[in-house]
Amino acid sequence: MATERYNPRDAEPRWQQKWNEDKVFETDNADPREKYYVLEMFPYPSGRIHMGHVRNYAMGDVVARYKRARGYNVLHPMGWDAFGMPAENAAMERGVHPASWTYQNIASMKAQLKAMGLSLDWSREFATCDVEYYQHQQHLFLDFLEKGLVYRKQSKVNWDPVDNTVLANEQVIDGRGWRSGALVEQRELTQWFFKITDFSQDLLDALDTLDQWPEKVRLMQKNWIGRSEGLTVRWEIVPETAPAGETEITVYTTRPDTLFGASFLAIAADHPLAKDAAAKNVEIEAFCEECRRAGTSLAALETAEKKGLDTGIRVRHPLDPTWELPVYIANFVLMDYGTGAIFGCPSGDQRDLDFARKYGLPVVAVVMPSDGDAASFAVGDTAYDGDGVMINSRFLDGKTTEEAFNIVADRLSAASLGNTPVAERKVNFRLRDWGISRQRYWGCPIPVIHCDACGVVPVPKTDLPVKLPEDVTFDQPGNPLDRHPTWRHVTCPHCGKDARRETDTMDTFVDSSWYFTRFTAPWEAKPTDPEAANRWLPVDQYIGGIEHAILHLLYSRFFTRAMRETGHVAASEPFKGLFTQGMVVHETYSRKAGAGREWVAPADIRIEEIDGKRRALLLATGEEVAIGSIEKMSKSKKNVVDPDDIIASYGADTARFFVLSDSPPERDVIWSEAGVEGAHRFTQRLWRLISEAAGVLSTVAAAPASEGEALAISQAAHKTLKAVQNDYDKLWFNKAVARIYELVNALAAPLTKVAAGEGDIAYRAAVRDAAEILIQLVAPMTPHLAEECWATLGNTGLLARTGWPRFVEALVVENDVVLPVQINGKKRAELTISRDADQNAVTDAVLELDAVKNVLNGQAPKKIIVVPQRIVNIVV
């Protein structure tokens, strides 16, 4: 009888070495079995993994191990999203080269991930900063360029003067750079773009096919793509107010039905008319500059105070040339959406209403709800932006909004301004082409050359890779490639004259937009092996954070389509199933208050509870510190737990089991020492029960019982097996944990009985069968412990190579059935009764139900109709 405690410090490295030696998790592309590709979003090599990583990779590993046991050929690779600004910041702060900083971090994090016992195919590992990876990215860029999916243009960009780089709109917070905090400037730069807008409609339509994605993510992408059907309307400028050479303003609108409610036009600060006005007026120039400095993300625009300035320009209403409207420059109009000009209908749009009230502009209600009263309907502080019936709209009065839309569209399309229709129907998208140029060193070089004679010349594919030079310095801001004495100077591949390399590098989102494809054949001399890519793609289960719901996932969807168009893959969608897991959160602790507040790490405090009141005390001094809110683990608030500490104290299996057990996987998990200790106690209990009975169980073959004392044991095990199998299929890890706890409780007494030498052969065989099922159920979550238990029962093969158990159908059939009971066709109760009960037994049991007695009130029913195993209907 084994009595020693389970020692993860001994067992975990031993089993990891065994898996590694046997190459258990290396995947053969030629394996003919059905494929299953599971992938967690690969990490940025920051230097340390955190508990969020542990949860993410533990989830993926459960799926990989489970599917492997179910007989699939599983691909479960790992790599590193290794380019980006932090490496350059480290180079500037510490004088270390970005490459050495990055590869040191990769080595540290790889050791941490290996200690978790993840079933990863490390033979396919790469970092996106490996030349062997990014040379293929350069190849793809050139293929996209040939296909017309890449172009270069002058573009207004958000420029961070501290980081000396371009920022996406989403990276500008309250007019400042998200990383540096510097006031962002607007600059005109020549940028490289991917033509993601070529696929706008397809990217939108295909969302309907992604039925294994969270609805929330699909909705976020739908809104980001932002398809709208509307009208471009040309407004004639009143000649006396027109700037030289200007005769009209074109507006895009999705609500032409509300034109009679118009009270102003608004243009973006970068609209040509605004620029013209700014050149002549200092006040307008200052206002336009203020608009440019503000955040340009949708969230920033929605929350900012609505401001405008009258340009003095007036336009004629397209449906009534005697009606003139003012033209404002407004801070909520973007040049890169629609035409950079809108008409304001204050009664139908809250933003326009706020603006009109602020500047004393007319507010005319033109749409009311279908059941409204035209005589009394008015707009107060809230605009009415719904559909309904037209009012105060002349020939449109009484029409529905849909009818009015079409009447206006037809009328204005038939009318002319000059020799061109006043309006035309147009489908618009909010989605913009993807600007990939970044003015930094640590990224994939863009493989083009600039020649004064030939213009922009692609680097010949035979000359790839364009490697980053290693001899660079970071002693001043800006891009070291611009300052390099030799790297940028080359000869033109066309004419042989002196030329210059492109010094911009690619947005790091490019690196992560196709890495999942490279994993299918990372040794290939071309970007992909189409046969391997077509076999493995799409990824069956992709797991990562909701923060990547839009950009990374949308860019990956674009890239897969672009790679399809250029012959690299057959798939259109990269990820068949998507799961977005919650974060790992922790209490915060702090000393002092206000500006002098100091955050305290969980490792530096102890919690004591007296009379139901919790207190946090500093370990060093006993000083009480404040317990704050539960928040995402972050270094700034020190509420982090180091996975290395947990693994050293409790073992990897305990850490894995806890992050999977405590809450539904899509929700945040609250880290608690008590929860971790509970998970650790479970691993110890499981080992004790199995190891103490192992001496006896190893002498019998596993066999489920079909009768007698052991039948209940086999039923519990096989019912749990069926249920947990369903839980794993649906990624309900916490439900699986709850069922496993129940099964351990059910098997505790039988295992103890067997350990004491009791029970006949059939009983012991049933207990062994149940114990093996239990071990196989926990194996995806606690693989080291499971291997140890499996081996102690005398099994010789690796559990990691063992197939999934099969439940016996007869053991999982429920003996009871729940029958709805109706009285005169209305459901009044439910009856739980044996499935084998005859009609008389059902009738007798129904009449004993309190709900039935209350309705009958002592009367005998006319008739009782029993549909076996379906329903009971009483006729009164």
UniProtKB/Swiss-Prot annotation:
Keyword match Hydrolase: no
UniProt GO cellular component terms: cytosol
Range of residues in the leader sequence: none
Reactions it catalyzes: tRNA(Leu) + L-leucine + ATP = L-leucyl-tRNA(Leu) + AMP + diphosphate
Alphabetized UniProt keyword annotations: Aminoacyl-tRNA synthetase, ATP-binding, Cytoplasm, Ligase, Nucleotide-binding, Protein biosynthesis
Keyword Cytoplasm included in the entry's annotation: yes
Gene Ontology biological process terms in this record: leucyl-tRNA aminoacylation
Chain location of the short sequence motif 'KMSKS' region per the record: 632-636
EC number(s) given by UniProt: 6.1.1.4
Principal localisation: cytoplasm
Protein family membership: Belongs to the class-I aminoacyl-tRNA synthetase family.
Protein name: Leucine--tRNA ligase
Organism from which the protein derives: Rhizobium etli (strain CIAT 652)
Gene: leuS
